[in-house]
């Protein structure tokens, strides 16, 4: 085990929106170290959101951030062995972990969609998540349901 917690490495903001959250998302989206390709996919998805959105009061980046917020879980279940039995114990999630889980789920369920390009899939999943629909939001709901069902074991917290 580590002697102390690893230091957080500073992330550079992305070139178009000057936002660190976007860079973090692109790092999760990236495959085989191809960051420029991942940035292109993300920016194309943002442009698609811009064309598909209904209301004019929100920018496409705000819609993406809303989608991320709607996918973000607040509680999760963790396994813990107590006297030979394994219990699923509901736990609060740290803020940075909430964001990472939301990003990973949004990307995972975008990849599972069946549109032509990854940019189109990501745009569709973001638009769906912004409206509280889609597979990524369903995953969050399922996680919350699981935590609610196992609320009785919350006194076993770590």
Swiss-Prot record:
The keyword RNA-binding applies. One of its GO terms (molecular function) is tRNA binding. GO terms for cellular component: small ribosomal subunit. Keywords: Ribonucleoprotein, Ribosomal protein, RNA-binding, rRNA-binding, tRNA-binding. One of the primary rRNA binding proteins, it binds directly to 16S rRNA where it nucleates assembly of the head domain of the 30S subunit. Is located at the subunit interface close to the decoding center, probably blocks exit of the E-site tRNA. This is Small ribosomal subunit protein uS7. The keyword RNA-binding applies. It comes from the Bacteria. Part of the 30S ribosomal subunit. Contacts proteins S9 and S11. GO terms for biological process: translation.
């Amino acid at each position: 085990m580590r002697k102390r917690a690893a230091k957080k490495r500073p992330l550079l903001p992305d070139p178009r929106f000057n936002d660190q959250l976007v860079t973090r998302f692109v790092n999760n989206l990236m495959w085989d170290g191809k960051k420029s390709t991942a940035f292109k996919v993300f920016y194309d998805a943002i442009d698609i959101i811009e064309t598909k959105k209904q209301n004019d009061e929100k920018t496409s980046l705000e819609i993406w951030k809303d989608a991320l917020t709607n996918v973000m879980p607040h509680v999760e279940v963790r396994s813990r062995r107590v006297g030979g039995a394994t219990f699923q114990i509901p736990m609060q999630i740290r803020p940075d972990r909430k964001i990472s889980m939301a990003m990973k789920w949004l990307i995972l369920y975008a990849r599972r969609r069946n549109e032509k390009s990854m940019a189109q899939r990501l745009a569709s999943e973001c638009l769906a998540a912004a409206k509280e629909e889609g597979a990524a939001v369903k995953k969050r709901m399922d996680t919350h349901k699981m935590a609610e069902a196992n609320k009785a074991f919350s006194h076993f917290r770590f």
